[in-house]
Regions:
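Active-site loop-to-helix junction immediately N-terminal to the catalytic Tyr of the SDR YXXXK motif
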Residues: 78, 124-132, 144
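Conserved NAD(P)H cofactor-binding loop of Rossmann-fold oxidoreductase domains
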Residues: 67-72
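Substrate-binding pocket helix/loop in short-chain dehydrogenase/reductase
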Residues: 74-75, 82-84
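Alpha-helical segment proximal to the catalytic Tyr-Lys
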Residues: 103, 147-148
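Residue(s) in the substrate-gating loop at a strand-loop-helix junction
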Residues: 118
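N-terminal Rossmann NAD(P)H-binding glycine-rich loop of SDR-like oxidoreductase domains
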Residues: 10, 14, 18-19
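Active-site helix of classical SDR
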Residues: 98, 134
Length: 151
């Protein structure tokens, strides 16, 4: 049974993953609100990854980072704070999570890290400037981590 740490498992993609994986895996969920699902294989920690201290985890085989936010506005209505918030949630939160749990992850069974991007990084979709910029940074982070951490 794999031990999977999901950040952002209370809604959206994170919740769908949690629901799909919880039957056959031990899931540790970190999110600001608890998921609606309750299961013997699920442990939840209420935590804001950006502002709170992350909980101690003894064992983990995979990290899945998927807190959700999307700021769909025309560039004329986006504020610099919107860009900062999207970057903080998508990049800084992922880096904080990875740095915190990497020593434990390296001891895991076939360790893996999963981060999410958006098709807007390659298609250039309208109203996606802020999230596309943040997710492009996530893609760069993934490439760098792959080169650094691959066996």
């Amino acid at each position: 049974m794999r031990k999977i740490l999901i950040v952002g498992g209370s809604r959206g993609i994170g919740n769908a993953l949690l629901s799909k994986l919880v039957e056959e895996n031990k899931i540790i969920n970190i999110s600001r609100i608890p998921p609606s699902l309750s299961h013997v294989n699920l442990t939840h920690h209420t935590c804001d990854v950006l502002t709170d201290e992350l909980p101690t985890v003894e064992e983990v085989d995979s990290i899945v980072y998927c807190p959700g936010s999307i700021n769909l506005k025309p560039i004329s209505r986006l504020k610099l704070e919107d860009f900062r918030n999207d970057f903080e949630i998508n990049v800084i939160g992922a880096v904080k999570t990875i740095q915190q749990y990497l020593p434990v992850l390296k001891r895991g069974n076939k360790p893996s890290i999963v981060l999410f991007s958006t098709v807007a990084t390659t298609l250039g979709m309208p109203f996606h400037a802020s999230v596309s910029a943040a997710k492009s940074a996530v893609e760069g982070l993934v490439k760098s981590l792959g080169a650094e951490l691959a066996p």
